[in-house]
Swiss-Prot record:
UniProt region (Coil 1A), positions on chain: 77-117
Membrane topology annotation: Lipid-anchor
A Gene Ontology term for the protein's cellular component: nuclear lamina
Region called Tail, residue ranges: 427-611
Function in brief: Intermediate filament (IF) protein, component of the nuclear lamina, a fibrous layer on the nucleoplasmic side of the inner nuclear membrane, which is thought to provide a framework for the nuclear envelope.
Highest classification ranks of the organism: Eukaryota, Metazoa, Ecdysozoa, Tardigrada, Eutardigrada
Region (Linker 2): 269-286
Propeptide feature ranges: 612-614
Protein name, entry field: Lamin-2
Amino acid sequence: MSAQVSKKRGGSNPPKTGQHAASSTTSRTESSATSQTIYERQEVETRTQRTPGGLLLAASSAEVSSGTAGLAGSPLSRHQEKEEFKLLNNRFANYIDTIRAQQEEISVLRRKVETVSSKEVVENQKIKERYNLEIANLRRALDEVSRDLAAAIIERDSLRPERDARLLLDNEKKTLQKRSKDAEAALKDAKNQLAALRDQAKDHDNEIHGLTTENSSLKLQIENLKKDLSQETNLRVDAENRLQSEREKNALLEGIHNEEIVSLRNQRRTEITEVETRMGEEYQSKIVEQLNDLRADLEAVAHEMRLDLERSYQNQLEDSQDLANRYRDEARALLADLSAAQDRIKETQTRSEKQLQELRLQLQRLQAELNGKDDEVQRLQKLLADRQAELQNTHHELSRQIASYQELLDEKIHLDAELATYNALLRTEEERLNMKSPPFPSTPDSQRRGTKRRIADSYTRTRFRNEASATGDIHISEIDAEGQFVRLENKSGQDVVIGGWKLLMVSDNGEDNKTDYKIHSNQVIKAHSSTTIWSANTNVVHEPPADIVMEGRWLVGDHTSVTLSTSDGVEVARREMTQSSTRDDSYLGPSGLPKRSRLVVADSSDHQKNCVIM
């Protein structure tokens, strides 16, 4: 054996002892025209003659070729090798401790994120309920103000004829005063004009009869028009209230909470301005209406006075002086009635001004309450923004910890491969030199670490095949192999409403081979974004539209197909996943070295990387 080793050293092609291990990676993708594989496979092949263990083999060969002195130095070489492996084991143990610490830290951060997310959901729900209550109260207050405004409009319309009559009565009073003076002068010529007055009286009788009939019909029409106007006003107010309520309800269902508050505030200001403007116009027009009503009343009284005057001319011409005196008395009574009408007008005006002032105070109070609510909304929005920033920082920290953990995990994988190679090389050399390997110290830590470095005699190779198709913009981008989630992706530049759509999963997983899920009616997938539907057994927080937690579970098998259908039952997307497993019992080669180390890396789109050495 010594001669053989010396020959190898003295040959023309000595072995290269300073080269590092090399690896080759291959990736395989199997899919249809619209599908892509979500799992990548990386194979790492370790070559024995190019490992750092070559240095150890060269040192052992040099000792053997030196004759008896080389044989005497073999225990020292083995001792050095043992010390080197102890050093490697200690380093690897430190890596394992670091990974465990990182895992514990990640678990703590995940619990913190779940706590913050649950608190945020509860607080958002409370804020939403509080806002809904305030909006309902404001809507009821607005309905009450609208009803009061309708009542004021009806009262204004009812007082308008009285005001017109008062104005007409005032003008007629002036006319009657002038006619009274003319009548005193005309009494002297009454006898000469008696015949003409009698003829005119007959004409006046006919004209008065026609005017009386026309006046009755006009009064009936006015009453009917007043009733119709009152009904139309009530219907218009109710229709406006219903229309406003429907608009607010639609705005609330759209979920645009901040825009709704701004719109509501602007609407309140506009309504306040309109109410003030309408009340000012009503106040100006109410006086005109009351004067018109007064004028109509005076005109009716004037007609009655003219009838009395003509009858007096016909019946008692000789008592014309007494009739003139009676006209004076009636004029005084009309003056008294006019004064009373003016007092009533002033009282109505005062009452209207008082009502207008009360409405203005009520509007100011509502505006102050609305401003207070705006301040509260701003405070809550600021608090929500702070919470979201804190949650974002926590997510960033968690991502950083996961990246650090992944780096440590990659180093651990390479160290596992190197340690396995070193162990196999050492065992081969010890068998070739007929050397007995000394036992390792039987401590709990060494036993535990030894189990992690043990290379299995066999392994199972799992292969996944995915096929996907879609007829629209929504695609089924991923199916989790463990049945934790199904991901939908919107590949268009516009938002797509998927409310009422249905997901159906069919697998060969025993009797319960079907799982269906109906999407909520308000669900929308934003442009170039995705929505993930999680099983109920995961620890994911329900945060639509990005993450939705269903009540059931996804049941996957060796062959699983998922279809997405619209509310009408039209299939728009499909994805099928097939997994196959093969077992290889010849993991170690004839020399005791591993044939290859396989690294299976899951797709990074789900923010989880599962690395397995087989």
